[in-house]
Amino acid sequence: MSAATEPTKEKPVNNQDSDDEDEDIDQLIEDLQSHHGLDDESEDDEHVAAGSARPVPEELLQTDPSYGLTSDEVTKRRKKYGLNQMSEETENLFVKFLMFFIGPIQFVMEAAAILAAGLEDWVDFGVICGLLFLNAAVGFIQEYQAGSIVDELKKTLANSAVVIRDGNLVEVPSNEVVPGDILQLEDGVVIPADGRLVTEDCFIQIDQSAITGESLAVDKRFGDSTFSSSTVKRGEAFMIVTATGDSTFVGRAAALVNKAAAGSGHFTEVLNGIGTILLILVIVTLLLVWVASFYRTNKIVRILRYTLAITIVGVPVGLPAVVTTTMAVGAAYLAKKQAIVQKLSAIESLAGVEILCSDKTGTLTKNKLSLHEPYTVEGVDPDDLMLTACLAASRKKKGLDAIDKAFLKSLISYPRAKAALTKYKLLEFHPFDPVSKKVTAIVESPEGERIICVKGAPLFVLKTVEEEHPIPEDVRENYENKVAELASRGFRALGVARKRGEGHWEILGVMPCMDPPRDDTAQTVNEARHLGLRVKMLTGDAVGIAKETCRQLGLGTNIYNAERLGLGGGGDMPGSELADFVENADGFAEVFPQHKYNVVEILQQRGYLVAMTGDGVNDAPSLKKADTGIAVEGATDAARSAADIVFLAPGLSAIIDALKTSRQIFHRMYSYVVYRIALSLHLEIFLGLWIAILNRSLNIDLVVFIAIFADVATLAIAYDNAPYSPKPVKWNLRRLWGMSVILGIILAIGTWITLTTMFVPKGGIIQNFGSIDGVLFLQISLTENWLIFITRAAGPFWSSIPSWQLSGAVLIVDIIATMFCLFGWWSQNWNDIVTVVRVWIFSFGVFCVMGGAYYMMSESEAFDRFMNGKSRRDKPSGRSVEDFLMAMQRVSTQHEKEN
């Protein structure tokens, strides 16, 4: 905007004073080298999707920059496009709490509570209700603590804006900005809406870290897009608003987050699946019991007591509580390793992750620009090259960009250049010029010689030298070849030249810069490969930079431009080809937020469990969509809120450590679930047959105690010594059910033998003395408690020593069960010590049989083939379905654009 068209200011706008004194160069270098890069800015300019969910017609974006909109036009546009704020859906917390009482296991527990109340069995009623509320409370608290992502996104937005209305500069609340408004941008302004720069010949720098997580300010010129929640770091300009509210980039990110959060978690689906099958088995067993009871004309009260007993034992009432406790203990352990778990089910998901979609900056690299080996023209001293490059830099700490900081910090390797630098006096400094693409400084040497130092785009620096005198062909060719080589490898290269006194320009060389890989990343990537984890890089950097980083890290170099994916429409490839393309690629460069979301979605549709790392607002949708969303060190609040796990330690190694721990936790959960399903099947089979054949059942109070003891003892599984699998682990439900069924049958046979051999008329094992309820209670408790020692081991039960917590918990429960049997608590008659010893010996025999059976099933390939435990990817891929779904998505996208 020219001075002639400058609008009248109704309210002055404060400008920050940047005319501070030059700082001492020695102090500046020492300061930079002592901070270890904490203030370094990243070179990775993450791209942000332009456009909006609700496009504004171009004719509404032809506002006169000198006059702005009229008040009437503002009113019309606000009525059409609404306020400049994100829509918010409030959630009823009470309804959310009630949702934790819905599910197959919960339904059975609720039915059992109603039955217990009807039978006036208040002890059982209280125990069941207590378990129900405990499960719901733990789940609700975990979900509530995750926080509101939309609230975090809204925190990044501006509160007010300076706009041109009716030819005047006025300050208005940010939510009153409308499409077509002309906004004034200057140092420190937080941009309240998406827009486009309309000031000709402008040059401003904008901090988009609230969106991308990247700290390096982005250069913007006339016609470039700006985005809501970004901050102007340097320069002044005017912009026209192109999108507001939900149609801005931040608004669309919030919408994608809500979309991603709509589905139920993977672990919830697994538990519901197990609960559904157990519910069906309970119904089948109850039908058998009811038919037998009606045949014998049992009274309704007796039938209801049988029903209550089957209902209590048929479903593992403590399953949610034990699994939640196991994950909570694991989360506390991860917290010690600086990994904060915000969603407990993420631990289970992380254990099964096969593909990690990782950002580059800060995770794979140091997020710290550094100087690589400089290229010097023949005959030039490297110290002269370094000295000239550092002379062409600001002496103000606030004026230093990331490249200047990298050069100054590298002086530690060039002591002669560092010593000479302090002897030069800065006469003039001209910051980066977007037209000439170079930085210029005029200095005075200790001898009083005037020297012009320049650094900038290599070919522009070369042109500056050639304008004065020709360069030898071999020097020019070698220089250009080196620049081309560095560009192909993804380095950011700067040419350096100088002019001493009245002499000619001298081309000195090229300074290559790059964000280097972290020291431990290559080793960690190799370790990840051995753990069966594929790492795909998703970065906003250029393809060359991505490929060079992958080469240094030992990752695959099949890196493609994300344009081939398309934005929302999937590009031009058929759905099946697109899925193959994403599956086989090692990563994508120049990605937009929608690309990240699409990559995660496509891999999930192929049956993979996917983890995604991110640190910016633009990562929030894909973090929420992924099976495990990981917010890396330094992430924005919105990214942290969207993530399942937040890492406080930098680098990929922290993620790999957490993955190992999660696999240990998964092993504990898997062994418990096998154990607990076997227990439910055991009592369903035994009690169902006992009731149907002999019209008898255990005392209902003892049934409740058996259910409680089974879970109380195994709560300590959360502290057990567990190995981690060398490959991703998943819920192979067919194999799990096969093992549980066989173990349950062995347990039922053992209990049936106890029932039918210990109470024969003449000379039974217990010689017809004592209480059948007490004996059965002890035998069931012992064999069930000991089963956990079998399922927890990766090999034979003696191959792994359990933790003292688990051993102690089982021993305490066994002692209590023995006291029940000895003193006849809730079983009417006491039993002598000989009876108890015989039950212990017999139970150990059953334990050994179960141990042998479990080991054979674990090691048997034939059993695996029989159970056919395959993942979704082993099934026909359904390529025609993928093609159809992608075609429908493109039609939907095109329809949205047309409307």
UniProtKB/Swiss-Prot annotation:
Segments in the Extracellular topological domain: 118-121, 295-305, 720-735, 827-838
Transmembrane segments: 97-117, 122-141, 273-294, 306-328, 701-719, 736-755, 806-826, 839-855
List of catalytic residues: 359 (4-aspartylphosphate intermediate)
One GO CC annotation: plasma membrane
Keyword field: ATP-binding, Cell membrane, Hydrogen ion transport, Ion transport, Magnesium, Membrane, Metal-binding, Nucleotide-binding, Phosphoprotein, Translocase, Transmembrane, Transmembrane helix, Transport
InterPro entries recorded: ATPase_P-typ_cation-transptr_N (IPR004014), ATPase_P-typ_cyto_dom_N (IPR023299), ATPase_P-typ_P_site (IPR018303), ATPase_P-typ_TM_dom_sf (IPR023298), ATPase_P-typ_transduc_dom_A_sf (IPR008250), HAD-like_sf (IPR036412), HAD_sf (IPR023214), P-type_ATPase_IIIA (IPR006534)
Pfam families membership: Cation_ATPase_N (PF00690), E1-E2_ATPase (PF00122), Hydrolase (PF00702)
GO molecular function: ATP binding; ATP hydrolysis activity; metal ion binding; P-type proton-exporting transporter activity
E.C. code: 7.1.2.1
Binding site for Mg(2+): 615, 619
Primary location class: membrane
Function statement: The plasma membrane ATPase of plants and fungi is a hydrogen ion pump. The proton gradient it generates drives the active transport of nutrients by H(+)-symport. The resulting external acidification and/or internal alkinization may mediate growth responses.
Name of the protein in its database record: Plasma membrane ATPase
Name of encoding gene: PMA1
